[in-house]
Amino acid sequence: VTVMDLPQQLAMLKQNIAGKPGCDRIDTYPGNLLDPGTGIPGGFDVVWMSQFLDCFSEEQVVSILQRVSATLKPGASVFIMETLWDRQKYDTASFDLAQTSVYFTAMANGNSKMFYSEDLFGMIRKSGLGVVEIIDGLGFGHSLIKCGK
């Protein structure tokens, strides 16, 4: 397993896993995904992105996904875990996610929003990837999107 994140996040990861079973199987790769010049390591069978694309603008999401797509070996998959407000089982959950978007936009970085699924799927397609499968209802309202070239 290789984890890519900001150096300070990787330092916390290393502290948290030190001495735990399997810690020797976790590698780290520091980088700022918001910098279009940041390379992304390749050669993996699976790339997992969990609950962070919703923090960025469409342009930033497409840039990240394009760079991931460029590193994929044949047959590799990209899995994206997000809370998609229009794919919730209950209307109240959709409403709550929409209000979370308002909170994050106003209080965080001005970009954060919970995705409308077709908007995210459009960004995925724009990056050169395609949606292969969608699994809804994971955990508390999460969707897992399997992507490939």
Predicted regions and their residues:
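Alpha-helical subdomain
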Residues: 1-149
